[in-house]
Regions:
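Residue-level detector of anion-binding/catalytic polar loops
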Residues: 29, 83, 103
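C-terminal binding/interaction regions
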Residues: 5-7, 11-12, 90-153
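Nucleotide donor/acceptor-binding cores
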Residues: 2
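Residues that form or flank phosphate/diphosphate-binding pockets in enzymes
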Residues: 14-15, 41, 71, 115
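Glycine-rich phosphate/diphosphate-binding loop of Rossmann-like nucleotide-binding domains
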Residues: 5-25
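Helix-adjacent hinge/juxtasegments
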Residues: 46-86
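A short beta-strand-loop structural module common to alpha/beta enzyme folds
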Residues: 29-40
């Protein structure tokens, strides 16, 4: 089973706990990096905690939940080696792994309910990167991240 790391801000707290329980019941190894209450908190700090677990290799994939998923995805994508996608439909959650080799799924607790959230999570976790023509495009994302804009010419 894949090693998953999950985090949320105050808006995603209840949904995060539901997702964790379901993933653990399915046998996933889940690390919770917070937040641990509904008290208002800074989502960039949670995104940073999660991203460092993936960057270090301690965890393979991450899930971030905030109100819309957008703030978390913006923060996560500032971290080297992180490819975070904000998704609210299963097609995108699957293809972001297949084509973009995304390693963090973001969604909003104010956008999707538990049922859709689990559909997104399952699609994301079950999908694999297809490589091939997509690998060259992911390499260009990495080049951009490293400031090698000449690779884009």
């Amino acid at each position: 089973m894949k090693k998953i790391v999950i985090g949320c801000d105050h808006a995603g707290f209840q949904l995060k706990n539901q997702v964790i329980a379901t993933l653990k019941d399915a046998g996933y190894d889940v690390l919770d990096v917070g937040t641990y209450s509904e008290e208002s908190c800074s989502y960039p700090a949670i995104a940073h905690k999660l991203c460092t677990k993936i960057q270090s290799g301690e965890r393979e994939l991450g899930i971030l939940i905030c109100g819309t998923g957008i703030g978390m995805s913006l923060c996560a994508n500032k971290h080297k080696g992180i490819r975070a996608a904000c998704c609210s439909d299963v097609f995108s959650a699957r293809l972001t792994r297949n084509h973009n080799d995304a390693n963090v799924l973001c969604f909003g607790a104010r956008v999707v309910g538990y049922g859709v959230a689990m559909d997104l999570v399952n699609a994301f976790l079950e999908a694999e990167f297809e490589g091939g023509r997509h690998a060259a495009r992911v390499d260009l994302i990495t080049a951009t991240e490293e400031g090698n804009f000449d690779a884009l010419k």
